[in-house]
């Protein structure tokens, strides 16, 4: 077993930790075997050296080991739409809104997320504002996914070992490897994923990590405007992982018939603003908010395996808004979470 001193010396010298070594270090952190100063040293050492695909994959593997898992019966179209956040754009909750459409399409959405860190409203904040109960057991979250095709996994409920890391991250106040681990540690083990990232360099990196972790079909995306979603203001960088192969390309929303807009057109300063935007989209009100949600929901429908192409996924997303089926999913989630939390 590698000690934290040995690991830190390796990192200071600019050398990568081997996969098994990173497993050891991460387990020590998650068991509470390291002091806050030792944890901080490792995190900063990794950040300065720049985390490798192997190190990130090992860290995610251990976080999955320590997570409270969510049992899901039907896994064929199981998908997550969790992103890294941290893009600083303060848009409304695009991926959360998209989740209702994806569930209405027949996928099983295991939505993983938490409260706001860098944005005005995290997925948990807006869902709570909508009346969704977050304090559910892992078994009851699984029931939500099985019964209505959508369940929300509130990250602090499933990653309790993070209690050793959270104070250190807060005091450091800089990005660490944990800023990119959240979307890699879905407690339901979703093998299909639409993941937005806050930096262009992470597009290829996270796709390779997902491949190493055994993902089946995933799209890792970063808008050229900095958005950690598929953007409407211009091209989006994409790394698509499918059946072990990774293809990197740019996606232009104009090719799918969408008009361009700016991030300001999608702004939501508070959770209440985000709630209003989300409801407007689910009520099929036309405009940039509806367009960007259809674009991202279409991608999630595609990676979930419900459709064979992104274009088909987008068309289905638009139909589900028009029919009101996506709006019904919100009502179903509120009703079921209240019943299970009682």
UniProtKB/Swiss-Prot annotation:
Homodimer. Mg(2+) 2 binds at residues 228-229. HAMAP family: TrpD. The gene is trpD. One of its GO terms (biological process) is L-tryptophan biosynthetic process. Anthranilate 1 binds at residue 83. Binds 2 magnesium ions per monomer. It comes from the Bacteria. Gene3D superfamilies: Nucleoside phosphorylase/phosphoribosyltransferase catalytic domain (3.40.1030.10), Transferase, Pyrimidine Nucleoside Phosphorylase, Chain C (1.20.970.10). Its cofactor is Mg(2+). Its EC number is 2.4.2.18. Keywords: Amino-acid biosynthesis, Aromatic amino acid biosynthesis, Glycosyltransferase, Magnesium, Metal-binding, Transferase, Tryptophan biosynthesis. This is Anthranilate phosphoribosyltransferase. Mg(2+) 1 binds at residues 95, 229. Pathway: Amino-acid biosynthesis; L-tryptophan biosynthesis; L-tryptophan from chorismate: step 2/5. Catalyzes the transfer of the phosphoribosyl group of 5-phosphorylribose-1-pyrophosphate (PRPP) to anthranilate to yield N-(5'-phosphoribosyl)-anthranilate (PRA). The lineage of its organism: Bacteria, Pseudomonadati, Pseudomonadota, Betaproteobacteria, Neisseriales. Belongs to the anthranilate phosphoribosyltransferase family. It comes from Laribacter hongkongensis (strain HLHK9). One of its GO terms (cellular component) is cytosol. It catalyses: N-(5-phospho-beta-D-ribosyl)anthranilate + diphosphate = 5-phospho-alpha-D-ribose 1-diphosphate + anthranilate. Anthranilate 2 binds at residue 169.
């Amino acid at each position: 077993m590698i000690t934290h001193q040995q690991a830190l010396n390796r990192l200071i010298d600019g050398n990568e930790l081997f996969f098994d070594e990173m497993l050891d270090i991460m387990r020590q952190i998650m068991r509470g075997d390291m002091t806050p100063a030792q944890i901080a040293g490792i995190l900063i050492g990794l950040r300065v050296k720049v985390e490798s695909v192997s190190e990130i994959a090992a860290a995610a593997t251990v976080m999955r080991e320590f997570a409270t898992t969510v049992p899901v019966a039907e896994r064929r179209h199981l998908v997550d739409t969790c992103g890294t956040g941290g893009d600083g754009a303060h848009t409304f909750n695009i991926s959360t809104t998209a989740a209702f459409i994806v569930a209405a399409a027949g996928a099983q959405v295991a939505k993983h997320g938490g409260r706001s860190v860098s944005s005005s409203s995290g997925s948990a904040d807006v869902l709570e504002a909508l009346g969704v109960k977050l304090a559910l057991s892992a078994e009851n979250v699984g029931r939500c996914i099985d019964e209505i095709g959508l369940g929300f996994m509130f990250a602090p409920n499933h990653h309790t070992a993070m209690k050793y890391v959270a104070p250190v991250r807060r005091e450091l106040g800089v990005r660490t490897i944990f800023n990119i681990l959240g979307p890699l540690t879905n407690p339901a083990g979703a093998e299909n994923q639409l993941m937005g990232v806050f930096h262009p360099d992470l597009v290829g990196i996270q796709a390779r990590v997902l491949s190493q972790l055994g993902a089946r079909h995933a799209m890792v995306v970063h808008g050229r405007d900095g958005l950690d979603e598929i953007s409407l203001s211009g091209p989006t960088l994409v790394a698509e992982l499918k059946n072990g192969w990774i293809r990197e390309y740019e996606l232009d929303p104009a090719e799918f018939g969408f008009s361009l807009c700016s991030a300001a057109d999608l702004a939501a300063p508070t959770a209440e603003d985000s709630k209003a935007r989300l409801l407007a989209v689910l009520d099929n009100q036309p405009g940039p908010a509806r367009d960007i949600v259809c674009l991202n929901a279409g991608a999630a429908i595609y990676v979930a395996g419900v459709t064979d192409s992104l274009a088909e996924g987008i068309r289905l997303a638009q139909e589900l808004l028009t029919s009101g089926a996506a709006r019904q999913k919100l009502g179903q989630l509120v009703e079921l979470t209240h019943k299970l939390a009682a």
